Amino acid sequence: MNNTNNMSKKALQKLELTWIGKGDEPKLEPRILIENPEFSYGDPNSENMLIHGDNLLALKALEQDYAGKVKCIYIDPPFNTGAAFENYDDGVEHSIWLDLMNRRLSILHTLLSKEGSIFVHLDDNEVDYCKVILDSIFGRNNFINRITVEARSPSAFSTVNPGVFKASEYILWYAKNKSDWESRSMRIPSPRDTAYNKYIVNREKDESEWVFIPLKQAFLEFINRDRLDKIDVFLREIYNQCRLFSKSQIEHWIFENFPIHLVFNLKQVSNYLHGKLKIDEYDNFWQAVYMYILDKCSYNYSERDIDDFVFQNSQSVFRETEISDDGAGQETVRLKYLSIEKPTQVFKLERDNGLDSVYVWNGKQISFYSKNVEEVDGKLSATKLLTNVWTDVSWEGIAKEGGVKFKKGKKPEKLLKRCFELTSNKGDLVLDSFLGSGTTAAVAHKMQRRYIGIELGDQAKTHCYSRLKSIIDNEQTGISKAVNWQGGGGFKFYTLAPSLLKKDKFGNEIINPEYNANMLAAAMSKQEGFKYQPHDSIYWKQGQSSEQDFIFTTTQFLTLEALESIKDEMQAGETLMVCCKSFQQECKSKFGNITIKKIPQMLLGRCEYGKEDYSLNIINMPVDETEQDLLDDNLEEISVQALRDNKQSNDQPTLF
């Protein structure tokens, strides 16, 4: 009974999501990455990486060198629709998916910089479960937002089933440390707000001289600017000479005296003016007919033309907004009542700290439209603040983006562009471990971010490689025009090295024969926490963990003479770890600053060697027949055997 009570109390201490297999974390092997120069392209000094292999092993391979260095992560993992789990019951199905995500998100959290953030794109099958995992790994206090994306629209084909049509997908957005993360706002295109319907003719002058007219009048005068004088003469002459004319006489008079009639319907205008010419006083007549004539003289303009005029002159376009006695500042409220007493006068309140001045007229504040106009994708546009509901990112036409086909999984380049604009700057590192058709890497490349993309499937070559290659060659789909993409740059193509250890025919674990000396040295450096960077002239300095701590791996028998020779070359304060298959007994503990470890014995039990795939085969991406032919005929896997016998040279692929 006491036992049960204790367990209940313990359970109440922490609320958590659990699943089958939780806590049974694999001991991942930190593999090295081998460049395949055949599929690297462009700038040979590029830091961009395209990795073909299991993404959990690839993330582990990156962990040592990239922990805390990634500014933005976007992942679009399998949605777990159920079709891929037909052999499992519901509980196991969810457990598999949750376990897959938990392992990867844990490493992704490690890779993020303290200012970084992650976007996880999902549908409603697992989004709520995934949020609990993200809360656990990142902390609920680091949750930024749940973004709802309108990913599809109803069509005859997609709406045959009854019920509410599912149009949305979701992006969970978390910071590594919200206190270090930079919050950014963004404005997006929107329809022009027609409530801003007044215009200041002489905005550049002192506010005491401002002249106000309706926005429509300002626009019509702008497009008729070459005929305003003629319109003025026309109105004055017709008032002076035609007040007693009949409709037909007015029509004839206009026809004979003013070619301006060619731009409007003469009979319609004559009938209208006949009634207005009876108005006493020319000024009253002018007020009654000016806008009508101005409009009739205008032709072939559209709402887009009005929009462009407003955007170009937004600093002169305004609306009047109410001033709340409770919400506004004390001085603003004072000017409100002062302006009511003097309704024709504009009052100005200058503010400190770079804030815009406040203008009050006739008891209301003048709000300029300029704050709602920004340059978007190279042109001025009406904008509104971005919210967490994204309905303006179109999925239509994305099949052609990047020149690759990718059914049921391709994301718009515009979507990734927005994510990167919210979270990163040029030169920052972004990562996608479910690269798919390569959209994340494509957008990062065009936006001049550094990137790492990981993809297990064949589309790493058929889609990602070819897409990035065409981008470097200046393809112009997707966001290319919006960012003025001109081509250039490069990337390196990597594959995961095979497992370091394998079993021989007797069941004993041995160093994998596919490893040559350089690969083994790189692998041992990674295993022991050193960075593999062979010294130009000192052969035993193959890697280092600090300025004075080095590692040396050799497959040869280590003699005391060889060890003493190394010791003589070492500088004061330097330490060395030697990893070798065998060594002379006298070498053991000979020097206090040299540690000797035997391989493969030192590696046994550390990792899960020999496992190549942690993907659980959740989905198989569709490959077109033409793409499959390309894969079969033109693309070959990197030959590790060929690398094994190569000596280190300038032509040797990079080991990472």
Predicted segments — roles?
Residues 10-23, 94-102, 127, 412-485, ...:
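Conserved S-adenosyl-L-methionine
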Residues 164-180:
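Core SAM-dependent methyltransferase catalytic element
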Residues 452-656:
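PRPP-dependent phosphoribosyltransferase catalytic core
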Residues 95-148:
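Conserved Class I SAM-dependent methyltransferase catalytic core
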Residues 1-72, 81-103, 271-360, 580-583, ...:
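DnaQ-like (DEDDh/DEDDy) 3′-5′ exonuclease domain used for proofreading
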Residues 68-83, 134, 430-444:
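Conserved proline-anchored active-site loop of SAM-dependent methyltransferases
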Residues 41-57, 61, 397-431:
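Glycine-rich adenosyl-nucleotide cofactor-binding module
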Residues 4, 12-14, 177-402, 413:
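Active-site-adjacent helix-turn-beta-strand microarchitecture at beta-sheet edges
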